Amino acid sequence: ASLTQHADKAIPLLVGSTDEEARLYMVPGGAIDRIAAPAFAGALERAGLAPNAPNVYAQVRPNASPGDMLAALESDSTFRMPAQRYADNRAAVGAPTWNYQFAWQSPGFGGRLGAAHVVDVPYVFNTLASKQASPFLGGQGHQPLADTMFGHWLRFVKTGDPGWARYDLATRPTMRFDTRSAVVADPLADRRQLWAGKKFN
């Protein structure tokens, strides 16, 4: 309740997610390869999205499989869009908010893990060399990205400002963390628009 009532309005906040959160739960055990087209179609129908949703999700990866598309749909419904909506709600009441997306593609699990849930954690804390991070990084990782993310998070902790444009509803400036990180206006807008008006718990 405190989140929706903006009891935290004065507190600066970083809000974001990885691009492909749900792949952590679908790639390592091979579930992503067992998803048939009807399963994705059923999930899409239950979500009640706009008629162009199949075309939007077909673009999430080159030659996207039903499993790829379902992973993207689940990433949006359970992680990305709730975070996005929270950032939107904070921006609407003037709460200091900075939005980010983690886009770096992990080569883990045969190059299929991608920008999955938890892949961003060793980058934020600059712990790429840890034994726990190795399976998710699929190798040594990309140290310049870790330096960049850790630097922004450290600055935020010290100053309350991570060092990129504050989020607003006019241009939706969002830091995209990747091998080349940059602030982008309203990235993945087509997927955000699919979920406009949907409620999240």
Locate each region found by the language model.
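Non-catalytic, well-ordered alpha-helical segments in soluble enzyme domains
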Residues: 142-163
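Mature extracytoplasmic/periplasmic domains
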Residues: 159-187
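Polar low-complexity intrinsically disordered regions enriched in Ser/Thr and small residues
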Residues: 19, 163-166, 200
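Tryptophan-rich aromatic "cage" segments
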Residues: 182-201
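Substrate-gating cap/lid region and adjacent catalytic-acid/histidine neighborhood
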Residues: 1-140, 152
